[in-house]
Amino acid sequence: MIRVRIRRTFQTKNHSREKYNVPHIDVKDHLPYKTLLYYVDDSDGDSVFFKNTVSDNILLDTDAVIDKKISPKKGRAVYFDGDIYHSGNCPIDFNKRTVINFDFKV
């Protein structure tokens, strides 16, 4: 296990469903690794996954290309390579969004 983190974001009315937080990878100095996101409760504020990886050397705020969006549903888990850029979004309709993030070597 490299890292376990619980992240809770709260409702914001000035955020848009079309926007997302800054794309990132979790732990740059431990590549390669896997990430598992576990959604603690139902919410909105999708997780956004990009086609881009760390090796693409892109400008994240202008060049990132969205691959898919995953909605937080209680008990849902998403497993992916740790070098894939991803981002969360603050909830708009729900009061909170809680995710447990596991980064680990396989």
Please give the residue ranges for each predicted region.
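Catalytic core of non-heme Fe(II) oxygenases with the double-stranded beta-helix
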Residues: 1-106
